[in-house]
C-alpha cells in the first residue's frame, strides 16, 4: 500500500499547488449535490477535501458512498480556499485539497456516539467503545501530553545520569500495604506470586547493588477501593538514589517538575517549592495534601470555647477533642437553612455528628447556638475567626481526626461551590515531618504511615522502641493543587534499625525473617545510605490536562468497580485452567468459572 506524503493537520499554504496523498478518518461529510465536502482527520488534525465532477467524476461518485469514520486514502492538489470560506477554527482553515483519487480503505458502522471533543455519551458507553472514545480530539491531546511528559522525565533523568532498570512484575506478597493482586503458580501448587504495589524493595536492592541512581516508569497494582483519582493499575515515576543528600533529591525533583511545567504548560513555577510540616498542614487545612490555591484555613477555637455553656463544644474538649471553625466570607446571605443542613449531612461520612454554624449580622452572632456565645466569648470568637458582617461561620467539635477530616472536606467543597479556587494556578508544596507510624485501632498495633522501610528522623531514632507514636519520619510528600503527586523518604539501610522498625510494627523476629529475611541479609553486605521518591504519572497528567479523573489519562482504564467494559475483564476461566493451577472455586461447579 502506498504511503502518505503529509498528515492532515500539517498542511498549510506552503503546500499550495502541491500534489499530496493523505490517509485518515471521515470527521464529517456535506453533500451539496454537485460538490461534496469531507473533513478528513488523522492524529495531527483535520483538513477539508473537495470532490466535484470538474476534478474527478470517479472520485465524486465514490465520495457519495462515504460516511462518518470511513477510512480513506486520497490524492489531490492543495489549493487556497476562497476568502469567504476560510475556517478560523482549524489550523488548515485557509486551504483545501481537491481530490483526484479516492479509495475507501474501510467502512464504519453507525456510531454509538459522535467523535467530537464534547460528547453527551455516558462514561460506560465511552469505556465500552474506548477505541472510538480515544479518537476524540481531547483524548488524543491527553495521550499526546502523557507521551510528552514521559519523554521529558526520561530525558531529564538521563541527563542526571540515572539508569532506567526494570524490576519484576511477579514477586512475593508481603504485608504492610493495600491488598495484593495474587497470581497462582502452575509450577508451585498452592503458592502465589503478587503483582507489585510498587518496586520499593527491589529499588532498594538496586542501591545495595551499587547502581546509585535508578529510575523506572513502572506499572503498579493495588487491590483497593477506587475513587476518581485511583485505579487498580497505575503508573509510577519511581526514583531511588544512593549517597544523595535529601535536599539535593528534593531540589532535583523540583527542577524536573519545573521543566515539565515549562515544556508542557508554558508556565514558570517559583523555586524552591514551599514546605509545610504535617502537623501544620492538618491544623491549618485539615489535610496532609492541602489545596493552597485559596485561603479559608481552619481556626483553632478550643481555648475560647472550652468553658462554654454549649455542651457540644465543652464536652468534646473535656474528652480530649478539639473545636475548630471555618469562615465563609460573605456567605451568610448565600446559603439557605436547607442548604446549611445539607452541609451537615455532607460532613457525616467523615465522622462528624453534626455541623454547628453562626451568621454575623450588624456585629452580632445569629443562629441556633448564638445564645451560648453572647458577650465576651462571642467577641473573642469573632476576633479569632476574622468575622465581619455577612460572614457564615462553621464549627466542628470532636476528636481531632474527625475535626480535621470533616472540616478539611467542607473547606474543599465550599471552595469549589463558591468559586474560590483559582483554577489557573499550579501550587506545588512539600509536606514534611510526617509521623513514622500510626495506631490501628482494629489491628491493635502500630502501622507504618508510609511503608516500613522509611527511616525515622535521626533525632527521633532513640524513641523508636519506647515511644513510636512520637517518632517523625524522614519523609516528604509532593502535593499539587490538593492532590498527592507522590511521596518519598530516606530509607533505613542498617539491619538493626530495620529490625527495630519491624518490632515497632508488631513483627516477631520470626515473622520479620520470613517476610523480609532477604532484605535484612542484604543490609549486611555494605548497603549505602539511600532515599527516593515515587510520583504518580497518571495523576500528574490528569492535573496537567485539566481532566476530572484518572480514567481520562489512561488509554484503557478500569471502572470504579475495577472492571474493563471493553474486554469484559475480569472474566471466566475454564475448569481445565483451574485444574492446571490446582485451584477450585468454593461453591462453583460449572464448566466455566467466573473469577
From Swiss-Prot:
Keywords: Aminoacyl-tRNA synthetase, ATP-binding, Cytoplasm, Ligase, Nucleotide-binding, Protein biosynthesis. It catalyses: tRNA(Asp) + L-aspartate + ATP = L-aspartyl-tRNA(Asp) + AMP + diphosphate. GO terms for cellular component: cytoplasm. It is found in: Cytoplasm. It is an enzyme of class 6 (ligase). GO terms for biological process: aspartyl-tRNA aminoacylation. Its main location: cytoplasm. L-aspartate binds at residues 176, 222, 450, 491. Its EC number is 6.1.1.12. ATP binds at residues 222-224, 231, 484, 536-539. Residues 200-203 are annotated as: Aspartate. It comes from the Bacteria. InterPro entries: Aa-tRNA-synt_II, aa-tRNA-synth_II, aa-tRNA-synth_II/BPL/LPL, Asp-tRNA-ligase_1, Asp-tRNA-ligase_1_N, Asp/Asn-tRNA-synth_IIb, AspRS_core, GAD-like_sf. GO terms for molecular function: aspartate-tRNA ligase activity; ATP binding; catalytic activity, acting on a protein; nucleic acid binding; transferase activity. Catalyzes the attachment of L-aspartate to tRNA(Asp) in a two-step reaction: L-aspartate is first activated by ATP to form Asp-AMP and then transferred to the acceptor end of tRNA(Asp). PANTHER family: ASPARTATE--TRNA LIGASE, MITOCHONDRIAL, ASPARTYL/LYSYL-TRNA SYNTHETASE. Belongs to the class-II aminoacyl-tRNA synthetase family. Type 1 subfamily. Homodimer. This is Aspartate--tRNA ligase. The gene is aspS.
Amino acid at each position: 500500500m502506498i504511503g502518505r506524503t503529509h498528515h492532515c493537520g500539517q498542511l498549510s499554504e506552503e503546500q499550495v499547488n502541491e500534489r499530496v496523498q493523505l490517509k485518515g478518518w471521515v470527521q464529517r461529510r456535506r453533500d451539496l449535490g454537485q460538490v461534496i465536502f469531507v473533513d478528513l482527520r488523522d492524529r495531527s488534525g483535520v483538513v477539508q477535501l473537495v470532490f466535484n465532477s470538474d476534478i474527478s467524476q470517479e472520485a465524486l461518485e465514490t465520495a457519495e458512498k462515504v460516511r462518518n469514520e470511513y477510512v480513506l486514502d486520497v490524492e489531490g492538489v492543495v489549493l487556497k480556499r476562497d476568502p469567504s470560506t476560510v475556517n478560523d477554527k482549524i489550523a488548515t482553515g485557509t486551504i483545501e485539497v481537491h481530490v483526484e483519487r479516492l479509495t475507501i480503505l474501510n467502512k464504519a458502522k453507525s456510531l454509538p456516539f459522535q467523535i467530537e471533543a464534547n460528547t453527551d455519551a455516558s462514561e460506560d458507553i465511552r469505556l465500552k467503545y474506548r477505541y472510538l472514545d480515544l479518537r476524540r480530539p481531547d483524548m488524543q491531546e491527553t495521550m499526546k501530553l502523557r507521551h510528552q511528559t514521559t519523554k521529558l522525565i526520561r530525558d531529564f533523568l538521563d541527563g542526571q545520569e540515572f539508569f532506567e532498570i526494570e524490576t519484576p512484575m511477579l514477586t512475593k506478597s508481603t504485608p504492610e500495604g493495600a491488598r495484593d493482586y495474587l497470581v497462582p503458580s502452575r509450577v508451585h501448587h498452592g503458592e502465589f506470586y503478587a503483582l507489585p504495589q510498587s518496586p520499593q524493595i527491589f529499588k532498594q536492592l538496586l542501591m545495595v547493588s551499587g547502581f546509585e541512581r535508578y529510575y523506572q516508569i513502572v506499572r503498579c497494582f493495588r487491590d483497593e477501593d477506587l475513587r476518581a483519582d485511583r485505579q487498580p493499575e497505575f503508573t509510577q515515576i519511581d526514583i531511588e538514589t544512593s549517597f544523595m543528600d535529601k535536599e539535593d533529591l528534593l531540589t532535583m525533583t523540583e527542577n524536573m517538575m519545573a521543566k515539565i511545567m515549562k515544556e508542557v504548560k508554558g508556565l514558570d513555577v517559583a523555586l524552591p517549592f514551599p514546605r509545610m510540616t504535617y502537623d501544620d498542614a492538618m491544623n491549618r487545612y485539615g489535610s496532609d495534601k492541602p489545596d493552597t490555591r485559596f485561603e479559608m484555613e481552619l481556626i483553632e477555637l478550643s481555648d475560647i470555647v472550652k468553658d462554654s455553656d454549649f455542651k457540644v463544644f465543652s464536652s468534646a474538649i473535656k474528652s480530649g477533642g478539639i473545636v475548630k471553625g471555618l469562615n465563609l466570607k460573605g456567605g451568610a446571605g448565600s446559603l439557605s437553612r436547607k442548604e446549611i443542613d445539607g452541609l451537615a449531612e455532607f460532613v457525616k461520612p467523615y465522622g462528624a455528628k453534626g455541623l454547628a454554624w453562626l451568621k454575623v449580622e450588624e456585629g452580632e452572632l445569629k443562629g441556633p447556638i448564638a445564645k451560648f456565645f453572647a458577650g465576651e466569648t462571642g467577641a473573642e470568637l469573632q476576633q479569632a475567626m476574622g468575622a465581619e458582617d455577612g460572614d457564615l461561620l462553621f464549627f466542628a467539635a470532636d476528636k481531632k481526626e474527625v475535626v480535621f477530616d470533616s472540616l478539611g472536606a467542607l473547606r474543599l467543597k465550599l471552595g469549589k461551590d463558591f468559586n474560590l479556587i483559582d483554577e489557573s494556578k499550579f501550587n506545588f508544596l512539600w509536606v514534611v515531618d510526617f509521623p513514622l507510624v500510626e495506631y490501628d485501632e482494629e489491628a491493635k498495633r502500630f502501622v507504618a504511615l508510609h511503608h516500613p522501610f522509611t527511616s525515622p528522623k535521626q533525632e527521633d531514632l532513640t524513641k523508636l522502641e519506647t515511644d513510636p507514636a512520637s517518632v517523625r519520619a524522614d519523609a516528604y510528600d509532593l502535593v499539587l493543587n490538593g492532590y498527592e503527586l507522590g511521596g518519598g523518604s530516606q530509607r533505613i539501610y542498617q539491619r538493626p534499625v530495620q529490625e527495630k522498625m519491624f518490632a515497632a510494627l508488631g513483627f516477631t523476629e520470626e515473622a520479620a525473617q520470613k517476610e523480609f529475611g532477604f532484605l535484612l541479609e542484604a543490609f549486611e553486605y555494605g548497603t549505602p545510605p539511600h532515599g527516593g521518591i515515587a510520583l504518580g504519572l497518571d495523576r500528574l497528567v490528569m492535573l496537567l490536562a485539566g481532566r476530572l479523573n484518572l480514567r481520562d489519562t489512561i488509554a484503557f482504564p478500569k471502572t470504579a468497580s475495577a472492571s474493563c467494559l471493553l474486554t469484559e475483564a475480569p472474566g471466566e476461566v475454564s475448569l481445565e485452567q483451574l485444574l492446571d493451577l490446582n485451584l477450585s472455586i468454593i461453591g462453583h461447579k460449572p464448566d466455566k468459572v467466573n473469577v
